Structures are given as C-alpha cells and as structure tokens.
C-alpha cells in the first residue's frame, strides 16, 4: 500500500470516528484523496532547493501531506518543509500519523504541527514576517462566531472582516504567501457575489491574481459522503503576474473542460461590487459583450429592490382576520411563471394586522415585480419573477414575505409599461446565462439584481408597451432590447 492510499484510509477512518454532528457544526469536511491530488497538481514546479508549504485548518492532514509528496517526488527540491495547523485535538492522532508516514520514507522532509487556532498562529506568523511558497487549504465553512471574543479581537487587529470562516482563511493565507507564492483552496462559491463579500473581493483582487477556477457541475459530488450540497470551487491564487485565468467546469478532475479567459472577462472594472464571473465557455463572451453595452442599472433607473419584511416564524401580528385594514401576505408560492396567483396558497393566518409597528412592512397598491429569493443552479431559470398588479390588491396595502424580493420606486409601485418591460428583460435567456456566471448561491440576492446592467428607461417602457399591446410578434423579445 503506497503512502497516498494510507492517507486516504486514515481520512475515511477519521470520518467515521468524528461525529458528523461536530463536522456539521463547524462545517469542516475532509478532502478525498483524488481531489487533494488534483489540487496539489495545480501548483507549479518550484525551482529553488527549499520549499515551504502551509496547510491551515489541516484536519487529518491529507492536503498538506499529498502536496508535500508532489515536491518530494519531483526530484527538484532538496528540502520540503510542511507546517500544519489544526485546532481540534481529536484529529491530531490522524494528522500526526499521516505526517509520520512521509517522515519514515523521506529524510529531506520536515514537519511542524500546531494544535492551535489558525487566527492566533496567523497573527504570529505575519508579525514575524514568515511566509510560505505554497499554501493548500480546505477551511471550515461556518459563519464567524460572535461569541469568541479572542478570535474577534485578533481579526480586528489584522483588519480581517469577512463574514465567513473560509473567507477569513483565504485572506490570511494569501497574506502569508511569499513573493511568487501560490495558494490553492477548495471553498464555497458564495464569495464570488453578494454584498457581504464585496470588501473581501476588492482586497483579494488587489493583492493576488486568480490563476485558476474549477467549478463542479453538481453541488452533490464533491463531499457527497457528508451530504454537502453547497456549490464548491477550487481556486488558485498567485502573486505572480498572469494574463489569463483558466476556468474548468466539470465533475471530472481533468483539463478536458477548461478554457482560458482574460482577467477583465472574469471581473469588470466598473462593477461596484467586484463580482467574480465564472464563464462556462468562450461563447459566454458574446453574452458579456451584449449586456455590458447596456447603459443603466436598477439604481440609475431610479428603482430599488427590497426583501420582504414579514418573517413568518417570528411575526407576532399574523392573523386569520380578513378585515379590510389588514394586509394580505404575498408568499413565494404565489409566484408562478411570471404571474401572481393568490389562490394557490392560503396559510392559516394569511394576513398581517395593520398598526404603527407593521405599517412600515406594507406596500401600497401599485405595480411591482416580485422575485423569488430561493433559486438553485439546477432550476431552468435562476431569476423567477411575477408581476404584482394593482388588480391583485383587494385593499389599500399588501405585504411581502421574507423569501421574496420586490422592485419598487420610492416604496411605491411602477408604471405598468415599465413593469412589463423590466420583467421581460429579467426573464431573457441571455440574462439568465449572465447571472449564472457569478451567482452560485441557492438564492438570488438583491445585489445580484442591482449589479445587472439594464436597458434605459425609454427602451424598457417601449418594450413594455409592445408586450401590453401584443405588438412584438415580428421580433423576439431579446431583439427588442438589443437590436436598436
């Protein structure tokens, strides 16, 4: 049995030993050996004799071990030094065992293991000016603990303020890279878009280059033995100067589905959120070129998008009383194929009592675009809308449940022709493909819609008029927007 087989068997055994509940609590999942090997092979050769490797959040140590073997077996490096950091003492036996397997065979291998919080060690390493040539990580995916004051204090001192543990690890790790260092990480795709990660993306893109992204087609394949359904990417960051980014979209761990893109096709200079786009093929460039020529945005149209303010499980003013002063609640089940159907779902308490507290949760009678927040990559469409018209209101106000977003103008409705034009645009196939480039979430965020280039108000209203009057028979809807 070779070393990699032994390491993989140790990972499988650790998975059985460590309670799944604990793994899910910290959302830390051990990397299978085929993925660990693939990640290690993304690193370029290292010409210097001595190479330093960091495995932060090492778990059972298989990533750092397999990465070390790559360089030990290359014959080009006289000395390989691995630093592994893992806070969970229950994993130390497996971590030490995997490291020992390599030490037994290679005399030019040195390993340091820290049973410490990575934030604490990272602060120490950065203070001492220590850096690494190669860093490989599969960090925990959990949110930042608001109760761990020691961690929060360290992150504050280091000026790290990302919303998630994995993004903290990425930021600290690229700061620990040597001059031509490389970082390979397997992480959720969620950092690519959304306003919560805007500051993180801007800092990352300023300090390192994205050399490689591998997006798995299925959300279920990567960590299937753990029942993880997040969309996951492997990303390679480097401090070297590069001109192109290689993108692979496949469940297979090879280069057969890879294409190279210019860096300005991955991120756009005029995007205030610095979204990271993951094009699926070169044909996507036609989509980008078409949409990027549009001159407006939701904000420039004078429109806003808000999330429904009724959170059902904690709303104390829900009622079954169908009084005219109470507001009907709009739920996501009411949104069906561009339409609103209020007959399809009637919970036991479908109204919200109107009072001084709930008034601000209500929208006045008018025309709105309603957008479902929950949206999976497997769905036929990522943006699922419905037109809420004045006729749907059987009273002066309505309210929107939290699983929906709605587009409005100064908290009121829109002109009917604008509603139809904007809804048609959001439902274009080309817009769907554009959104899929950057949104890997299980939901469509308000910021996703805000970041979309839009036609100007005149075009939207003109198309809306044609749709209302059914005068678009000679053209496809897309042609009405893009063939001027």
Locations of regions flagged by a protein language model:
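Signature of N6-adenine DNA methyltransferases within the class I
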Residues: 24-25, 29-38, 58-65, 79, ...
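Conserved acidic residues
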Residues: 51, 133, 368
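Polybasic, glycine- and aromatic-enriched phosphate-binding surface used to engage nucleic acids
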Residues: 286-483
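A structural signal for isolated positions on well-ordered beta-strands in alpha/beta enzyme cores
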Residues: 52, 81-83, 112, 184
